[in-house]
Regions:
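A short, contiguous, amphipathic alpha-helix enriched in charged residues
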Residues: 93-117
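Conserved glycine-bearing catalytic or ligand-binding loops at nucleotide- and phosphate-handling centers
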Residues: 9-69
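Long, charged, helix-rich clamp/arm modules that form nucleic acid-engaging surfaces
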Residues: 95-96, 120-176
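Short hinge/gating elements
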Residues: 4-11, 84-93, 131-136, 165
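Short, small-residue-biased leader/transition segments that mark boundaries at the very start
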Residues: 2-6, 177-181
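A common structural junction motif
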Residues: 29, 111-115, 151-158
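Hydrophobic side chains in well-ordered alpha-helices
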Residues: 21, 103-106, 146
Length: 181
């Protein structure tokens, strides 16, 4: 039956900035013929509560135009020089729906299993002021190489699979189609 169709369809709409969405709705009210490009002038893209850096606009455009798209999100990091001549990677934002404790555990596991060499310590210094995961590096290690390895082997870089379905007048539509209703 129809209920079975709904059960097989999983909606996964990324969170957005409420102010931008309101501006987009006002745009649609003022101009009922506005295009998705017009809306994207107001709604820039997802606004993930854990932050992160969205890589490129392609996945966002696909999601808005077709109702589904793959949005690549990467942790926000800084490379800092320490007084002892070594470097550290500081993670201040992580991709949406990534569990911070599991991320730290995974990095420690990769170091323990010697799948990542060059990390001397990892600790979570997060507090009420915000997220702060500190990854201290050994001497003479290239921080960017370690960082790229972390992106590849951990959830410091993830893909958010947007599936923007809506129920409109009893019909299941992608939000790009629902806007035409």
């Amino acid at each position: 039956g129809l209920g079975d169709v709904y059960k097989r369809q999983a909606t996964n709409i990324p969170p957005h900035n409420l102010g931008e969405v309101i501006d987009g709705v006002i745009c649609m009210i003022d101009n009922p013929d506005c295009t998705i490009d017009d809306l994207m002038q107001h709604i820039k893209g997802p606004d993930f509560p854990t932050g992160g850096i969205i890589l490129g606009r392609r996945g966002i455009r696909e999601a808005y135009y077709t109702g589904h798209g793959r949005i690549e999100v990467r942790a926000k990091t800084n490379i800092e020089e320490m007084p002892n001549g070594r470097s550290r990677i500081v993670v201040t934002e992580i991709p949406y729906q990534v569990n911070k404790a599991k991320l730290v555990e995974k990095i420690a596991e990769l170091v323990h299993d010697k799948r990542i060499e060059g990390i001397s310590d990892i600790r979570d210094e997060s507090d009420r002021q915000g997220m702060r995961i500190v990854i201290e590096l050994k001497k003479d290690v290239y921080p960017q190489v370690i960082l790229n390895t972390l992106y590849k082997h951990t959830s410091m870089q993830e893909t958010f699979g947007a599936n923007m379905l809506a129920l409109v007048n009893g019909c299941l539509l992608y939000t790009s189609d629902a806007a035409d209703e």
